[in-house]
Amino acid sequence: HPETTFATLCTPFSFPKLRTKAKFCAIPSTSGTATEVTAFSVITDYAKGIKYPLADFEITPDIAIVDPALVATLPVKQVAYTGMDALTHAIEAYVSTLNSPFTDPLAIKAIEMVFDYLPASYDMDMDAREQMHYAQCLAGQAFSNALLGIVHSMAHKTGAAFSTGHIPHGCANAIYLPYVIKYNSHEPEAMRRYADIARRVGLGGTSEKSQVNALIEKIESFNRYMNIPKTRKEFGVNE
């Protein structure tokens, strides 16, 4: 489609009809983005400091090969960042206003798996890396239908916006996620669903508020364990 412009592609769901001659097979090499099962992609213009999200079901792969052998040697920093990206996908899908009985089981199972396996995956446990590879795929199927929230909105807007350099997407998500949970939990339905997540992963608390706080504290503990900065300033952004 040589007649198609990039500006057109940046308009959601405006892609021309694709794959009339060939099928699209996607094979993920990290355990986080779940691009192999979603209708979303991102192109970053570092010169302009802009990340362009692309959204169209025409870019959803026809076939996904989720092979955990491909992440056996993934560096631990990428394990941390992509793992927190997967967790953010699942949590935002579960709390999304577009959640449904079809997306909830995928999202909550992905959350449980990330809580169970991400620290061990970071520590080079191969069984845990396999499970994380599956978890991120489940999270992708959830958010591709329920969509995401302001964690991702901010991560996309700020990922390439600063002169001090690019903030990796998963790192930005990990930084923002605890703050967004705290902010969103002022809305009763969001608090209820965050508290439900906390209960499902075995966190304590005698009220929904205390359960949400326990969830925030657990996510922050993951970040500390995997050496993820708490703020943009800690990452190195000085503006």
Regions found by a protein language model. Give the residues of each.
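Carboxylate- and glycine-rich phosphate/diphosphate-binding segment that chelates Mg2+/Mn2+
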Residues: 40-146
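Short helix-capping/linker segments at secondary-structure and domain boundaries
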Residues: 94-99, 146-148, 182-192
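Gly/Pro-rich interdomain helix-loop hinge
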Residues: 161-164, 170-238
